[in-house]
Curated annotation (Swiss-Prot):
Gene of this entry: rpsI
Stretches the record annotates as Disordered: 105-130
Any one GO BP annotation for this protein: translation
Protein name: Small ribosomal subunit protein uS9
GO molecular function: RNA binding; structural constituent of ribosome
InterPro entries: Ribosomal_Su5_D2-typ_SF, Ribosomal_uS9, Ribosomal_uS9_bac/plastid, Ribosomal_uS9_CS, Ribsml_uS5_D2-typ_fold_subgr
Length: 130
């Protein structure tokens, strides 16, 4: 018998996460490693679990994630976005609570490019009057 799976793709900064929800007991596996091994910050792990806590499905599904690009924060945001989208496939009723928490909106903030003549995106070289 084929197992039921729900898919969602999440993006944040330069990270892309492909998320699979499988009925299980609440494990989160990122790139074949437990989430506590993969992401070293408890605050980011809580961020990732937010959609599951809001919909009260934390112990109902195993989350299998493939994520690439970006750093810890961007990847955590991408995983959170992907889980939220996958939960919509599970039950469209979750849309209102997830939308209210702002979990279905792709965060558009990106790193601003460095401009020539400047030291960073906006930081100008030191100005000397004389």
């Amino acid at each position: 018998m084929a197992q039921v799976q729900y898919y969602g793709t999440g993006r944040r900064k330069s990270s892309v996460a492909r998320v699979r929800l499988v009925p299980g007991e609440g494990r989160i596996v990122v790139n074949n490693r437990e989430i506590t091994e993969y992401i070293p910050f408890a605050a980011l792990i809580e961020d990732v679990k937010q959609p599951l806590n809001i919909t009260e499905t934390a112990n109902s599904y195993d989350v299998l994630v493939t994520v690439h690009g970006g750093g810890f924060s961007g990847q955590a945001g991408a995983i959170r976005h992907g889980i939220s989208r996958a939960l919509l496939e599970v039950d469209p009723e979750y849309r209102t609570s997830l939308k209210r928490a702002g979990l279905l909106t792709r965060d558009p903030r990106m790193k601003e490019r460095k401009k020539y003549g400047l030291k960073g995106a906006r930081r100008a070289p030191q100005f000397s009057k004389r």
